[in-house]
């Protein structure tokens, strides 16, 4: 089974994340940040990854530490659940519309972490959530999941729609890239015979 649980505790946050890559998209996100929970719910639903996130953070300071640390823990959980990545599809490209917004997400589950993130938010906040934290979350996730990730909003006018298209695009890209490819017969999808090195 491709599952993992990661616990992360610092002076700023106390987080537990569980993933099942072969789930049905069931989400149970409780971070204390309503908009962020909504994004995590979308991520689970559209990736078909079962996801449980329990986070207690220093929200009296701001949402930064909780958002970033959930990205770290979720990335680590996905990486651990993938194991040696044998048999996965590895690559995926998604164009994700959300009303007037269109975002392109391209992923390589390579073991080599990298992020390109290009999205301009017309507002500084979505409710009480700082829009700059969207990039912070993607950075933390990509670096800890060990994926090369390109996220680019091609156009959009509504900050909520832009954020949602980024998370949904990642979800659909993850869904395709971590899927088992029956044609590879359990081989690691690399001419080197391994990923991440």
Curated annotation (Swiss-Prot):
GO biological process, one term: L-histidine biosynthetic process
Major subcellular location class: cytoplasm
Catalytic reaction annotation: D-erythro-1-(imidazol-4-yl)glycerol 3-phosphate = 3-(imidazol-4-yl)-2-oxopropyl phosphate + H2O
Subcellular location per the Swiss-Prot or TrEMBL entry: Cytoplasm
SUPFAM superfamilies for this protein: Ribosomal protein S5 domain 2-like
Class in the EC hierarchy, top level: lyase
Record pathway: Amino-acid biosynthesis; L-histidine biosynthesis; L-histidine from 5-phospho-alpha-D-ribose 1-diphosphate: step 6/9
Coiled coil ranges: none
GO cellular component: cytoplasm
Pfam families, sorted: IGPD
Molecular functions (GO terms): imidazoleglycerol-phosphate dehydratase activity
EC number annotated for this UniProt entry: 4.2.1.19
Keywords: Amino-acid biosynthesis, Cytoplasm, Histidine biosynthesis, Lyase
Similarity comment text for this entry: Belongs to the imidazoleglycerol-phosphate dehydratase family.
The protein's name: Imidazoleglycerol-phosphate dehydratase
Gene that encodes the chain: hisB
């Amino acid at each position: 089974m491709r599952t993992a649980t990661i616990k992360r505790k610092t002076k700023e946050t106390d987080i537990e994340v569980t993933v099942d890559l072969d789930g049905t998209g069931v989400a149970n996100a409780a971070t204390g940040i309503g908009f962020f929970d909504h994004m995590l719910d979308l991520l689970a639903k559209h990736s078909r990854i079962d996801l449980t996130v329990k986070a207690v953070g220093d929200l009296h300071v701001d949402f930064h530490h909780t958002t970033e640390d959930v990205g770290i823990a979720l990335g680590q959980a996905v990486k651990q659940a993938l194991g040696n990545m044998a048999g996965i599809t590895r690559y995926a490209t998604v164009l994700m519309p959300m009303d007037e917004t269109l975002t392109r997400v391209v992923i390589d589950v390579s073991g080599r972490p990298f992020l390109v993130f290009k999205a301009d938010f017309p507002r500084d906040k979505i409710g009480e959530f700082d829009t700059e934290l969207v990039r912070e979350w993607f950075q933390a996730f990509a670096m800890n999941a060990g994926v090369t990730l390109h996220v680019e909003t091609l156009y959009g006018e509504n900050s909520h729609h832009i954020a949602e298209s980024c998370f949904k695009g990642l979800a659909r890209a993850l869904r395709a890239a971590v899927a088992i490819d029956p044609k590879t017969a359990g081989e690691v999808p690399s001419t080197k015979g391994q990923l991440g090195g």
